[in-house]
């Protein structure tokens, strides 16, 4: 994981966030027609990534032209949207650890490029539990359950391929 690499500096962090934005922004657009009851706008990560990139020195013109991932997982129904969201929502838990690492190593906080790492702030736990509760109550057929699982697997794989292609994994 880049965050723990000895060569990981502020420039590498900025490049990593650029790649994260290139994955999250188009994927969030793809998710937007599904699962309105989960308050997709509240759960969006791309706005926090933009704030971080601007805090780290990128201009709006530069962030408007960032490359976006074209190898996204398919989101064709609520079941696949849930699989994608499982990965994206779960990452907020890891962000809680990474925000402390970035604060200690580079002095990054909410205002200076760390908003994405703490995107839900004190609501991280409750939003994660709310998502799990929704997932638990979702009545899915065996085929839909398989789509949810496959979408989660595809999201992990797509994200890793994207980060490798952007050459941000140290």
Regions found by a protein language model. Give the residues of each.
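Metal- and O2-centered redox machinery and metal/ROS homeostasis
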Residues: 1-170
């Amino acid at each position: 994981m880049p965050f723990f690499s000895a060569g990981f500096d502020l420039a590498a962090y900025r490049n990593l966030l650029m790649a994260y934005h290139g994955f999250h922004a188009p994927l969030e657009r793809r998710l937007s027609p599904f699962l309105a009851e989960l308050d997709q706008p509240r759960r969006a990560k791309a706005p926090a990534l933009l704030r971080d990139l601007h805090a780290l020195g990128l201009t709006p013109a530069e962030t408007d032209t960032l490359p976006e991932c074209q190898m996204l997982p398919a989101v064709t129904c609520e079941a696949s949207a849930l699989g994608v969201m499982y990965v994206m929502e779960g990452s907020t838990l890891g962000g809680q650890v990474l925000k402390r690492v970035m604060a200690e190593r580079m002095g990054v906080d909410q205002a200076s490029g760390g908003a994405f790492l703490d995107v839900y702030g004190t609501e991280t736990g409750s939003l994660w539990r709310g998502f799990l509760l929704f997932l638990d109550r979702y009545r899915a057929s065996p085929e839909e359950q398989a789509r949810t699982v496959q979408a989660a697997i595809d999201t992990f794989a797509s994200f890793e391929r994207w980060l490798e292609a952007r050459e941000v994994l140290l």
